[in-house]
Amino acid sequence: MTRSEGDTWNLASSVGATATMVAAARAAATRRPRPVLTDEYAEPLVRAVGLDVFTKLASGELDPDDLERDVGFARMVDTFAARGRFYDDYFAAAGKAGVRQVVIVASGLDARPYRLSWPAGTTVYEIDQPEVIAFKTATLSRIGAAPTAELRTIGIDLRQDWPAALQDAGFDPAQPTAWLAEGVLIGFLPPEAEVRLLDSITPLSAEGSRFAADYGSLNDASQASTEQARRTTEGWRRRGLDMDIAALTYPGKHTDVAAHLGADGWATTTFGLADLFAAAGLPELTEAEQGPAATLSFVRAIKS
């Protein structure tokens, strides 16, 4: 089903299923002999969602190589592991710099407030759909997981007035903040909503604040991209999952996040997927392994 303004989803459908896919990839990466990252909460969260293909991937029942070939997404597990590690390292650097206020927008099934070692005095704010927040909180509570920082959750759609809800939860715009928008600005919001998100973050960011995100579009409407999306969608359907990649993203020219932040006074550094693989110690992607994420950019920024 094509995305529309104000649409809704859960973790088993539409864009929500991509959050479950990413968590399943983190669980699969955690099982490897020398994992790029360790996320012990990914598998129980994926199991609780109940999508068969992702449960099998997370549990080790399904060979990642077989799945990646079938859906046309080479090195999918490595890609999401490298991305996750990139942002884990970003938060570690922010903590060492003295930042004690963190905001994760559209957090999905990410469990960083539980799995990372945060400096004493850190408060983490998570923003996502109310149903997603409730599901994740309840699932982690059932398995006895406890946050490693003070955690405050805000159940609200990013297309609504989330800045007011964030401040109502105790967020202090006078304090430096480490922001993360992982997997958000890659076509899952309308272009105008991307701009609103960035324009809302800047005035809430004191000097010394940091921002990290990936950006671009998984489906740029080119013939090659359209064909890739078709093959991937057919692959997921063969695995019993109705996830139409092209229909998940909004059309239009999406935001150059680094340029937008730079114009607003942020000092930005951009990276490609190859940089993330190198930083994680993973073998580089071959020409044949260039998948949907290879066209994305990654940014880290500091507010001066």
Swiss-Prot record:
GO terms for biological process: methylation. It is an enzyme of class 2 (transferase). Keywords: Methyltransferase, S-adenosyl-L-methionine, Transferase. InterPro entries: Ppm1/Ppm2/Tcmp, SAM-dependent_MTases_sf, SAM_mthyl_Trfase_ML2640-like. This is Putative S-adenosyl-L-methionine-dependent methyltransferase MAP_0882c. S-adenosyl-L-methionine binds at residues 128, 157-158. Pfam families: LCM. It comes from the Bacteria. Exhibits S-adenosyl-L-methionine-dependent methyltransferase activity. Signal peptide: none annotated. Its EC number is 2.1.1.-. Gene3D superfamilies: Vaccinia Virus protein VP39. One of its GO terms (molecular function) is methyltransferase activity. Belongs to the UPF0677 family.
